[in-house]
Amino acid sequence: MNNVILYCRPGFEKECSAEVTEKAAAREIFGFARVKDNSGYVVFVCYQHEEADRLVRVLPLRSLIFARQMILVGELLRDLPAEDRITQIAGMLTGAVAGAGEVRVEVPDTNESKELMKFCRKLTVPLRAALRAQRILKGEEHRSPQVIHVLFIAPGCCYAGYSYRDNHSPFYMGIPRLRFPPDAPSRSMLKLEEAFHVFIPADEWDERLGSGMYAVDLGACPGGWTYQLVKRSMMVHAVDNGTMDEALMATGQVIHHRADGFRFEPPRNNVYWLVCDMVEKPSRVAQLAADWLVKGWCREAIFNLKLPMKKRYEEVSQNLRLLIDHLQVNGVHGEVHAKQLYHDREEVTVHARRFWSAVPGRRDER
């Protein structure tokens, strides 16, 4: 197996390809990408067979902006007979996987592929039984290092391979399944909820997303992101010249500031979260978030960067470098991650966390 498949948002295959090629080369792993527009996935072919397995181990999925999932697969299985699709799939996995803990039969995130979802669900049960009989899969759901993936790209055509549990998305197809509450003022609240799932480990939610925290939402109206914070029992300063959702204001957890988000300064010293989903130039939003973190006005920030029509990977990379450089120059130790979420469109979501500052006299939590 020398192919690495990366799931991505349809229309962003070129960005995903450029990113994996660049970051693989930085680890001295070389190959080429096969890209089909609007397919929802990229195939990165490593020149050396053993390098593909190394790539899915050493390249953190978390470091990839445009990839939702990363799996190692063999060659495309074509024209699988309708009466027996399982034999060839099991044959591809034999010798490559032993004692995996889970099997996922998936499709790319396209309208055409979603027509195969019903078939994938039907195939999963007999495939699981066959793989268990051959000891490719353990006898019960198990947290084994490997997870088997079968990716159908068309009827009778699939890739079969695996991911490593410590470097993959835990979500089916790399997509968290979230419910839109009927009382939410905007579907944008799903972006922030997904960001929490992607960026914040579940065992740290009580500490970092806890009740009673203070947050600032810049560009808040009508209140989609504020809603998500309020549901987590936070106190929110919502900053926007527009009108906030009345039900949100009635909770007593929101203070509405009619102000420019780029000029607003927090009225408290204990704001933990900054969130921002303003339609602005990405460089301006990145600089704004960097300023908040450097000044110690917040401890963590989640914000969206709207993407241009062309050179989208270059634009994101440039703005992330701006943010990281600004923190480093000002002696702020932290971490920065970015991901194009399922609920994002022509944008990416960035998470930045401040640990401590080397400069005394700032609002700081050591």
From Swiss-Prot:
Q: Does the keyword S-adenosyl-L-methionine apply?
A: yes
Write out the catalytic residues in the record: 306 (proton acceptor)
Location of this chain's protein in the cell:
Cytoplasm
UniProtKB keywords: Cytoplasm, Methyltransferase, rRNA processing, S-adenosyl-L-methionine, Transferase
**A GO BP annotation:** rRNA processing
Q: Pfam families per the record? A: FtsJ, RlmM_FDX, RLMM_N
Q: Which InterPro entries match?
A: RlmM_FDX (IPR040739), RlmM_THUMP-like (IPR048646), RNA_MeTrfase_FtsJ_dom (IPR002877), rRNA_MeTrfase_M (IPR011224), SAM-dependent_MTases_sf (IPR029063)
Provide the top EC class: transferase
* An example molecular function term from Gene Ontology annotations: S-adenosylmethionine-dependent methyltransferase activity
Catalytic activity annotation: cytidine(2498) in 23S rRNA + S-adenosyl-L-methionine = 2'-O-methylcytidine(2498) in 23S rRNA + S-adenosyl-L-homocysteine + H(+)
Q: What is its main location?
A: cytoplasm
Q: Enumerate the residues binding S-adenosyl-L-methionine.
A: 188, 221-224, 240, 260, 277
Gene Ontology CC annotations of this record: cytoplasm
Q: According to the UniProt entry, what is the EC number of this protein? A: 2.1.1.186
Q: Does the keyword Zinc-finger apply?
A: no
The family classification in the record reads: Belongs to the class I-like SAM-binding methyltransferase superfamily. RNA methyltransferase RlmE family. RlmM subfamily.
The subunit structure is: Monomer.
Purpose: Catalyzes the 2'-O-methylation at nucleotide C2498 in 23S rRNA.
- The name this protein goes by in its record: Ribosomal RNA large subunit methyltransferase M
Q: Which organism is it from?
A: Sodalis glossinidius (strain morsitans)
Gene symbol here is rlmM
